[in-house]
């Protein structure tokens, strides 16, 4: 969030608010108009930087997922090869392949750190392994884990190629949510449902998948029906919160400069149109006015004739067209305003300065109508929303760190106890036993000689 790296992100929000306050004093002043453009660009840059940094964090985790899957497959191949070596060495019933067994045990230990496994050794010394409930090391091969890469995000999803068909996609983890595009493509809908009580919170690979998330968090995840998809993922939730905050600021300011209303046509169709009776205009007095935050390649209005009258119909956001959304990455400060600030809608249509904009902006900025998430019970304004993001993030971080420290300490204690038994080398212990036995024999002979000499001296006396 860059709170510890130079200027705070919150400063861009505060500076934007200060710019709007100055603008309200004299909206026709080009200096004040320029300040709005500059601070709006700074605000969007900061938002995009924070959002992009979180995306890079996800990409870094994504690469770790690929590395771990590659390592798991490598371990599987090595265990399979060691199985054959152990069988060959011990087939005569005379030798024990201790070195190979130690190497295999070490690999199985490492594998258990990546995912939930079940290992079973038969009478010939061959170990068969199930990974997340599926056959991994079998009698005649190791079943490799495959990776599905999503377009756009590049996110990897581990799956089982040997049991995946056109009719049935088999992800390695059935309790981790799939990227929405993949889930729709393969017809496999599943949600993240991991808990200690379910005994499925096992392995670093699953932890990485959950930490990365299934996709990038956007403002629409903050709705009541979608929030559960990001609730347990800190990165996606923070992305969604930043996206939601930026969107609400952009929409609020655009609705002030370019207010909309509805019109019902004679045929019953309802349109969202520019409120030409109440909108402001730029210095040129033309309609429609220019919005402050514009979607790239997507105009705010389309001029249409309805019932014999001219209207500026609002080009609404649609799911079918991603570029129609007011969201980070799609929006920039209107290039027409950046090129000519006097086009900013600061005038009434009679040519006088619209000082009423100041009250509208103040009301919109200070209005407490935002919740940090659907479970929040106290509303806040724009700046209060950001404070809640930081507080929420800090609280989660503190909880996760305490939990991590506790589990790390517990794991270390268990591993120490285990190594007291399993970590002992049989060859080393056998060497010590032989050494101690030889020392005992030498000591025994020395005592016997002394005893005999003492007895002889007594007899001579």
Language-model region placement:
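Structural signature of extracellular appendage/secretion-system components
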Residues: 1-461
């Amino acid at each position: 969030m860059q709170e510890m790296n130079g200027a705070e992100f919150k400063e861009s929000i505060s500076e934007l608010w200060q710019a709007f306050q100055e603008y309200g004093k004299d909206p026709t002043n080009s200096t004040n108009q320029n300040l709005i453009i500059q601070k709006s660009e700074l605000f969007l840059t900061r938002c995009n930087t924070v959002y992009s940094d979180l995306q890079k964090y996800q990409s870094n985790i994504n690469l770790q997922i690929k590395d771990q899957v590659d390592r798991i497959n490598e371990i599987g191949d090595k265990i399979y090869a060691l199985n054959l070596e152990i069988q060959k060495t011990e087939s005569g019933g005379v030798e024990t392949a201790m070195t190979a067994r130690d190497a295999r045990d070490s690999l199985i230990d490492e594998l258990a750190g990546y995912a939930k496994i079940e290992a079973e050794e038969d009478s010939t010394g061959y170990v068969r392994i199930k990974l997340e409930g599926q056959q991994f090391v079998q009698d005649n091969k190791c079943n490799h884990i495959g990776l599905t890469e999503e377009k756009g995000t590049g996110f990897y999803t581990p799956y089982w190629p040997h049991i995946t068909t056109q009719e049935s996609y088999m992800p390695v983890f059935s309790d981790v949510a799939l990227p929405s595009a993949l889930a729709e493509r393969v017809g496999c809908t599943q949600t993240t449902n991991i808990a200690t009580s379910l005994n499925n919170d096992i392995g670093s690979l699953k932890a990485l998948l959950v930490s990365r998330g299934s996709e990038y968090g956007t403002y629409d995840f903050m709705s009541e029906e979608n929030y559960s998809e990001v609730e347990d993922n800190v990165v996606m939730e923070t992305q969604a919160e930043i996206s939601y905050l930026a969107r609400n600021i952009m929409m609020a300011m655009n609705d002030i400069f370019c207010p909309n209303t509805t019109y019902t046509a004679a045929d019953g169709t309802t349109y969202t149109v520019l409120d030409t009776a109440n909108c402001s205009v730029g210095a040129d007095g033309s309609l429609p006015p220019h919005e402050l935050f514009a979607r790239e390649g997507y105009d705010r209005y389309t001029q249409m004739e309805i019932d014999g009258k001219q209207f500026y119909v609002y080009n609404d956001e649609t799911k079918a067209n991603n570029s129609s959304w007011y969201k980070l990455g799609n929006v920039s400060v209107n290039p027409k305003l950046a090129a000519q600030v006097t086009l900013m809608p600061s005038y009434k249509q009679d040519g006088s300065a619209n000082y009423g904009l100041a009250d509208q902006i103040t009301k919109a900025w200070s209005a407490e109508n935002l919740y940090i998430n659907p479970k929040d019970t106290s509303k806040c304004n724009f700046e209060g929303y950001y404070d809640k993001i930081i507080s929420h993030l800090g609280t989660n971080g503190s909880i996760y760190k305490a939990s991590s420290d506790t589990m790390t300490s517990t794991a270390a204690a268990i591993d120490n106890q285990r190594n007291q038994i399993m970590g002992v080398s049989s060859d080393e212990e056998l060497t010590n036993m032989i050494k101690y036995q030889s020392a005992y024999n030498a000591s025994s002979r020395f005592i016997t000689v002394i005893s005999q000499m003492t007895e002889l001296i007594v007899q001579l006396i």
